[in-house]
Design a protein with these regions (language model features):
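N-terminal ordered "arm"
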Residues: 7-8, 120
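Boundary regions of SH3-family modules and the immediately adjacent low-complexity/disordered segments
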Residues: 1, 18-24, 32-67, 71, ...
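Surface-exposed interaction/gating patches
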Residues: 94-97, 157-165, 169-172, 187
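Catalytic cysteine-centered active-site loop
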Residues: 170-184, 188-207
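Short, intrinsically disordered, charge-balanced linker/junction segments flanking boundaries
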Residues: 1-5, 11, 20, 205-207
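Short, conserved micro-motifs enriched in small and acidic residues
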Residues: 11, 84, 176-180
């Protein structure tokens, strides 16, 4: 969860595997998200990685996003196996080559490795590049829809994705399947389809 500087008021939500950057150290730190949003969070919730790690992850192209409301990470490739973690829609994982019984092995940013159903994942389409090129004022404006997609296909995918949030409760600042706000829905359905927009419901220069 991201907060205002007071650490009380919620402003946004980031998910497992998402990248952020920060400059100052402390118990609470201000972070920049990969979509240009700022907020405060507890330092101990962040798994520290290098810029080189982020760039290598981008280059490798094996980052996948959870598309189901929730997906359990299991020790083995079967439903009876021990559950290691539960991920929500929007979380990023590294997909490995190993597959078995309709499951695929994934690696999480904290180093945990386990199996999730292959049907719960889709290749990530958005990018972290803003974080190592924050001075690029037109980064978000110049985004395009995924290569090979028509505008009609993109619009259809956005609508289909939005339907996945039907029945979710309202939660201020939320972007998850168990609680989401109005601008959070719009942000997430665009992110899931490869386009990063401003997180809040207002006109923002540069987006």
């Amino acid at each position: 969860i991201l907060y205002e500087e007071n650490g009380v008021d919620v402003v946004d939500e980031v998910f497992f595997g998402w990248s952020v950057m920060w400059e100052d150290e402390g118990e609470w730190i201000e972070v920049w998200t990969h979509y240009g949003y700022r907020g405060w969070m507890e330092r101990n919730l962040i798994e520290e990685k290098s810029r080189e790690w982020m760039e290598e992850r981008e280059k490798a192209g094996n980052t996948y996003v959870v598309t189901r409301g929730f997906a359990d990470v299991m020790r083995g490739a079967r439903v009876q196996s021990r559950m290691l973690e539960t991920l929500g829609r929007g979380c990023f994982v590294e997909k490995m080559e190993e597959t078995e019984n309709g499951y695929c092995r994934v690696k999480l940013a904290n180093g945990i490795s386990g199996f999730v159903p292959e049907v719960a994942l889709r290749k990530r389409l958005d990018s972290d590049r803003f974080l190592w090129g924050k001075s690029e004022e037109r980064f978000f404006v110049e985004q395009g829809i995924p290569e090979g997609w028509s505008e009609e296909k993109f619009r259809r995918k956005v609508v289909e994705c939005a339907k996945g949030y039907l029945g979710c409760q309202y939660r201020w600042g939320g972007k998850a399947a168990d609680g989401i706000d109005c601008s959070g829905v719009v942000f997430m359905v665009y992110l899931m389809n490869g386009v990063l927009i401003w997180r809040d419901a207002d006109i923002r220069e540069g987006y």
